[in-house]
Amino acid sequence: KAGKQKVRFQYFEDCYKENAFLAEDIRQTVQNGVPLSEIAVLFRTNMQPRALMEYMVSANLAFQTKDRIPDIYEHWIARDFFTYIRIAQGSDSRADFLSIMNRPKRYIGRDSLPDETVCFDEWMKLYEEQPWIAERIEKLWYDLKHLSRLSPYAAINYIRRGIGYDDYLAEYAEYRNANKEDFYEVADEILASAKGYRTFEEWFAHIEEYRQELKRLAQEKRRNQNAVTFATLHSAKGLEFTKVYLIDVNEGVMPYKKAVLKQDVEEERRLFYVGMTRAKESLTICSVKKMRGKEVELSRFIKEAGKEP
């Protein structure tokens, strides 16, 4: 059966190019008479399809999910970014300041903000005896002023590198005995999402539309509807589709980065085979050269299957 389908391999510069191709190719496939319900996009982890799903929402292509896709904009890292942006746009809410004032560490005490609203001048006066903290508050004021003039992508970048939020993530990861790369991955996803939007209004409107779609998907669980199926390789077992796309077939994703032992890699190889054999007629395997701005290697499974570009 694996021998019968038409297999093609696509190699992209990055995930943006990959997603643009997928949305357009799915549209073409439907124009050629294949119903949406006979098309599937398969992936290794439920974090992967966010950008493509946002693309599908914008392109007005219906899809359903076999797995619960986490809302990345609900993540505490995203909430911190949005809080910085809210304050930069004029919020003086004590709650907003409390949530980010020590991310990164500025050694500012919570009791320095007794009122419901924050006034920078009064705040700095409180620390006249500790000028090094007053300086940090002043720097925060300058950072927020600068932030208010940036595009969404530049703003997230500045929060991470200019303000030092990535340093906070590294410290927090160490404190929690977690891997900082996992936190950076979330931050990278949010940064990638902001790309291409000139204003916060545009970006936030897009986020809202996507979140509504996620909610609707969760409520409706629209099965057997005419919609493209999005599924992890685990959830795809036993299903078959006329046309299948396997996305992000790169080292670190497929096989997954946590698969180190021989038997774990073997299980990943089996999953890859599961993905390949879901296609009745046409299989497209997609890989990228760069993911979240970093160079990534082609998956060893592609080489083993003799599908190298």
Would you name each region that the model predicts?
Residues 1-62, 89-90:
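Helicase P-loop NTPase motor core
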Residues 10, 64-66, 231:
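General small-molecule cofactor/ligand-binding pocket signal
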Residues 14, 44, 69, 233-236, ...:
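Structured loop/turn residues at secondary-structure junctions
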Residues 17, 50-51, 73-76, 239, ...:
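Residues that form or flank phosphate/diphosphate-binding pockets in enzymes
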Residues 35, 53-54, 82-308:
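Conserved helicase C-terminal RecA-like lobe
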Residues 42-101:
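Long, highly charged, low-complexity intrinsically disordered interaction regions
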Residues 60-61, 307-309:
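Structural alpha-beta junctions
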